[in-house]
């Protein structure tokens, strides 16, 4: 049975390319900046994406005295994801569409410069899935890099805000958009693409930092030449060991040319290991959401990747959810940490997937070390087989096994995952990761859908609701919380502690040397907890719901903590897009989120504010 697909309310002009001779290696500059905790120079505070700060002026004893130091209104409503950069005492702030960038003087809080790109809202906004968000900026080579919603990548002079160059990264008329923060690596700017719900084939691209010229592009699926996979050198985990992927490892897992509209987009966060010269990231769900229309494992959607930063060639790749049947979009960040596992120090890559499993891999080889549920409510799979690396799917919750036009009930987690894009933090003091999580399940009904370029290519109806189970034991307890904040040991795959939250925690966390971990809540609280115990030490209600990441820096000898508030994102789409949540028929609106989060509007409204906190003088 075919059903009409309706575009949902969720969420240009290109300048001439200016040729600039020579190239510079910017990552030595970025590395130097990130080693000084007075800066917050990348989305994750460092190349490894750990979101940890050595600052400790704010600690477990005095954080209770924290108070707002100053605020800044962005002038834009809807979802504010990401967080501010602070580079050499200057703050850089971004907004959701229209993607305005502000440079702020911290002494006066005055705007040094602002830049708003020219974009066609009528073309771009209708094809933005899950709100008009933007996750932040990148700095390098004296430039601020903005990845616009309309896919244009723009380089701005960090001192003046003048455009240096811009380049088109995709075509919004085909459903392509961008929401992620780019990453500067050596003489390149790394970026990806959004649009999996429109049949966009995902890729990672590297542009020259000086000229904007394309250096390389590696697709998530397709022939080896497209994916930049070397059949004999690129490895994966199977049969209990690391081994070459072999020829046509992607196309052999698709029926016909379905891979050309196969999804696997790359709208998450990117990490980098300078010693290994590898870029790490995740690829998203296959298109369509109806698994019956795309037989096979659909490689390499739903995968973790390690690519050579110079050439884009794939070092290793690991697929977490073969033939994804639930939209468990695998784009979440990969944090790079050296840890002792079973008595041996390992260079690890740690990833908390929307599918509810926390993965620890050897980041050098791609060897699978740990794969365990970080929310025990997860039921779509019983476990991950460590030899094959494949999840063991429970047929009761298999949307393909149950069939098209059949409502598969009680699947945990819901499509927005046990964790969405909001990045984790890691404290070397405790050895724990801190996870902002969702505690939501769903009913999921796939249906046949036809592909039309630039039109939604979803093929499923879903509704979401509280998991009603204990996070640590998985036992039904009648709880109605939609979120939690969890401490996790990635060496053993065990939950250390977990705090319930009324709504999903959609804010990236921050760990500090002061023993404090910060995060924001959907109803708008900035919270501080003890890194060891999870005990709440501080809370403050900001002007709107928080889906931004908490960042910290130092200015004139004083530590500051800042976070953007502005409710939105998938969980907050009902408020952000003005969808009616007052009728039962709205349960499936916003791709299922409106019904689950209908009470959120009683706690917060639209906004767009940066709130900066500090201890009193």
UniProtKB/Swiss-Prot annotation:
The active site is at 327 (proton acceptor). Its cofactor is La(3+); pyrroloquinoline quinone. Its EC number is 1.1.2.10. Pathway: One-carbon metabolism; methanol degradation. It comes from Methylotuvimicrobium buryatense (Methylomicrobium buryatense). Binds one lanthanum ion per subunit. Catalyzes the oxidation of methanol to formaldehyde in the presence of lanthanides (Ln). Contributes to methane/methanol metabolism when La(3+) is present in the natural environment of the bacterium, allowing bacterial growth with methane as carbon and energy source. Thereby is an essential enzyme for Ln-dependent methylotrophy. Uses a specific cytochrome cL, encoded by the adjacent gene in the locus, as electron acceptor. Belongs to the bacterial PQQ dehydrogenase family. This is Lanthanide-dependent methanol dehydrogenase XoxF. Keywords: Disulfide bond, Metal-binding, Methanol utilization, Oxidoreductase, Periplasm, PQQ, Signal.
């Amino acid at each position: 049975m075919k059903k009409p697909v309706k575009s949902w309310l969720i969420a240009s002009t290109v300048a001439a390319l200016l040729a600039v001779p020579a190239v510079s290696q910017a990552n030595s500059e970025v590395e130097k900046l990130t080693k000084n905790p007075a800066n917050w120079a990348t989305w994750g505070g460092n190349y490894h994406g750990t979101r940890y700060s050595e600052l400790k002026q704010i600690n477990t004893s005095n954080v209770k005295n924290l108070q707002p130091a100053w605020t800044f209104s962005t002038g834009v409503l809807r979802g504010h994801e990401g967080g501010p950069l602070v580079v050499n005492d200057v703050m850089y702030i971004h907004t959701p569409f229209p993607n305005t960038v502000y440079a702020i003087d911290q002494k006066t809080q005055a705007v040094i410069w602002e830049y708003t790109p020219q974009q066609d809202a009528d073309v771009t906004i209708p094809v933005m899935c899950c709100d008009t968000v933007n996750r932040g900026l990148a700095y390098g080579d004296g430039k601020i890099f903005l990845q616009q919603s309309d896919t244009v990548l723009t380089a701005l002079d960090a001192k003046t805000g003048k455009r240096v160059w811009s380049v088109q990264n995709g075509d919004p008329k085909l459903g392509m958009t961008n929401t992620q923060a780019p990453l500067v690596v050596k003489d390149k700017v790394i970026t990806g693409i959004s649009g999996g719900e429109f049949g966009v084939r995902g890729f990672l691209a590297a542009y020259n930092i000086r000229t904007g010229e394309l250096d390389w592009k590696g697709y998530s699926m397709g022939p080896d030449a497209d994916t930049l996979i070397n059949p004999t050198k690129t490895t994966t985990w199977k049969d209990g060991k690391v081994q070459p992927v072999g020829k046509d490892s992607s196309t052999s897992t698709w029926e016909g040319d379905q891979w050309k509209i196969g999804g696997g987009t790359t709208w998450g966060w990117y990490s980098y290991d300078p010693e290994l010269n590898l870029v790490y990231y995740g690829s998203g769900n296959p298109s369509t959401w109806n698994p019956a229309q795309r037989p096979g494992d659909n490689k390499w959607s739903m995968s973790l990747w390690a690519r050579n930063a110079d050439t884009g060639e794939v070092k290793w790749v690991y697929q977490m959810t073969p033939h994804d049947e639930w939209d468990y979009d695998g784009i979440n960040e990969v944090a790079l940490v050296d840890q002792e596992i079973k008595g041996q120090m390992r260079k690890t890559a740690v990833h908390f997937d929307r599918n509810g499993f926390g993965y620890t891999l050897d980041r050098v080889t791609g060897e699978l070390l740990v794969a365990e549920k970080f929310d025990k409510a997860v039921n779509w799979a019983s476990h991950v087989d460590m030899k094959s690396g494949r999840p063991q799917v429970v047929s009761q919750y298999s949307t393909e096994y149950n069939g098209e036009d059949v409502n598969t009930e009680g699947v945990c987690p819901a499509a927005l995952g046990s964790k969405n894009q909001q990045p984790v933090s890691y404290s070397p003091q405790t050895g724990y990761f801190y996870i902002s999580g969702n505690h939501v399940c769903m009913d999921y009904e796939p249906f046949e859908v036809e592909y039309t370029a630039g039109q939604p290519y979803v093929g499923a109806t879903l509704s979401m609701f509280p998991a009603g189970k204990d996070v640590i034991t998985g036992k039904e307890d009648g709880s109605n919380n939609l979120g939690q904040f969890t401490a996790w040991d990635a060496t053993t795959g065990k939950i250390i502690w977990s705090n319930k939250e009324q709504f999903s925690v959609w804010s990236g966390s921050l760990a500090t040397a002061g023993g404090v971990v910060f995060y924001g809540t959907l109803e708008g609280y900035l919270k501080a907890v003890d890194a060891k115990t999870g005990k709440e030490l501080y809370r403050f209600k900001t002007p709107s719901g928080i889906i931004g990441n908490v960042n910290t820096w130092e200015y004139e000898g004083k530590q500051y903590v800042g976070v953007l508030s502005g409710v939105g994102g998938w969980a907050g789409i009902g408020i952000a897009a003005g969808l009616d949540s007052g009728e039962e028929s709205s349960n499936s609106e916003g791709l299922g989120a409106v019904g689950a989060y209908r009470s959120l509007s009683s706690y917060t409204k639209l906004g767009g504010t940066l709130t900066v906190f500090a201890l009193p003088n």
